[in-house]
A protein has these predicted regions:
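A short acidic, helix-capping loop that chelates divalent metal ions and anchors anionic groups
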Residues: 32-37, 123-130, 191-196
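Radical SAM/AdoMet-radical enzyme domain recognition
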Residues: 44-64, 72-182
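Accessory C-terminal segments flanking Radical SAM cores
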Residues: 192-255
Length: 255
């Protein structure tokens, strides 16, 4: 399948719920959130029918997102059923990690290929401030479970905000140094609830990395299906990636 710009479309993202067990300040207004009623959400059968239609159009990779996808009771069934479709090569999810510790075994058995975990800070107090929940320890345990699992790719998504975690960049990068995790920095889009916050650009981060580490160079391989691009650093087990919607336009590479 190709779009009007002749880009090959082989990847689909499906949001299976708007519900979330965190209340991140740049994402939600607070506690009073008007969620979609359950009966108006796509059912298990409807989601699988949609994925099957995309598969027939040439889509080979499926990303399951939310909200928080792990709060749906049918998430394991969905992953396992999609993995059984002959044309689907990869199924991945994006999660905040709160439920990972208790669900990692089921996710492995369902055949999950890749997992993206949102983590914007390594400071428990700052985490509580950003998410309005005290779940830092359980998320960190979930990340360790993912690292130890047989799931092939584990990535951390970090939204950089100058006022909040601008002093933690190197600490977050160290996670890719010591473990197989790929750390991805996502540029904040200062709109909506985040309009008064200050983003940190890819160039600022690269400048910091080049001053602190030797052997920082673009990674020539491919680690995912979206617009992220990666750098490898000498001695690192994981890679450092960027999704730079503000400072580096990536529309031409979107699939």
């Amino acid at each position: 399948m190709r779009d009007q710009y002749q880009r090959k479309i082989d990847y689909v993202r499906i949001s299976i719920t708007d519900r979330c067990n965190l209340r991140c300040t740049y994402c939600m207004p607070g506690e009073e959130v008007d969620f979609i009623h359950h009966e108006k959400l796509l059912s298990t059968e409807e989601i699988l029918k949609i994925v099957k239609a995309f598969e027939e159009l040439g889509v080979t990779k499926v990303k399951i997102t939310g909200g928080e996808p792990l709060v749906r009771k049918d998430i394991i069934e969905l992953i396992a059923s999609i993995k059984k479709m002959a044309g689907i090569q990869e199924v991945s999810i994006t999660t905040n990690g709160v439920l990972l510790e208790k669900m990692i075994d089921d996710l492995e058995q369902a055949g999950l290929d890749s997992i993206n975990i949102s983590l914007d800070t390594l400071k428990p107090a700052q985490y509580a401030l950003m998410t309005r929940r005290n779940q830092f320890d359980i998320v960190m345990r979930g990340i360790q479970c993912a690292i130890k699992s047989s799931i092939p790719k584990v990535k951390l998504n970090c939204v950089l905000i100058k006022e909040i975690n601008g002093d933690e960049i190197l600490d977050l990068v160290e996670l890719a140094h010591q473990t197989r995790v790929h750390v991805r920095f996502i540029e904040l889009m200062p709109i909506g609830y985040a309009k008064n916050l200050t983003p940190i650009s890819e160039d600022e981060v690269l400048d910091l990395l080049s001053k602190h580490y030797e052997g920082v160079k673009p990674f020539e391989g491919k680690l995912g299906n979206g617009p992220a691009h990666y750098y490898e650093i000498e001695g690192f087990l994981g890679k450092v990636g960027f999704i730079s919607a503000m400072s580096h336009r990536f529309c031409s590479t979107c699939n």
